[in-house]
Amino acid sequence: SSSDDAASNDSANSAETTESGSGEGKVQTVTDGKLTVATSPDFAPYEFYAIDEDGNPTLSGFDMDLAQYIADYMGLELEIVTVDFDGVLSELQTKSVDLGMAGLSPDEKRESIMDFSDIYYMGGQSLVTVKDNADKYNSFEAINKSDVTVGAQTGSIQLDLANENTPDADIVS
């Protein structure tokens, strides 16, 4: 699964800068000397807030470690911009950031407006419901009814899949 599955956090933007960078960056970035990365920290283990020993939230996760590694490799300081998931896509489209790291899954629409790295994790998509409804809601056909509510994150591939496969359902994002 991708962070497309995760619930959206609040829409306030914030930036966190980490010190590293072992020299002058040789690549053009949004801000000289920095690698600016947008993320939506609501999709553990990729990006999320962990509470440190002092009780303070700190950005953590695989994508955050990878972003730091890339910044270090390039000799740049890392700046993380936190936004809602659909904000990551907007930040990329407006070229306000150098990278978006939020468990993004490539699809034709996204590939027409942005470049993707090689895939470093292969996930899948599935329907999720409470255990008591597992036998009742076990296919697209079973949930493609006007009295069934289907939820998916705004801007996600899952929202596209819900619209394509369950057009008669009450789809909310």
Where are these regions (language model features)?
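Glycine-rich, phosphate-binding/catalytic loops in enzymes
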Residues: 53-55, 117-118, 168
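Acidic, polar ligand-binding/catalytic clefts
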Residues: 77-142
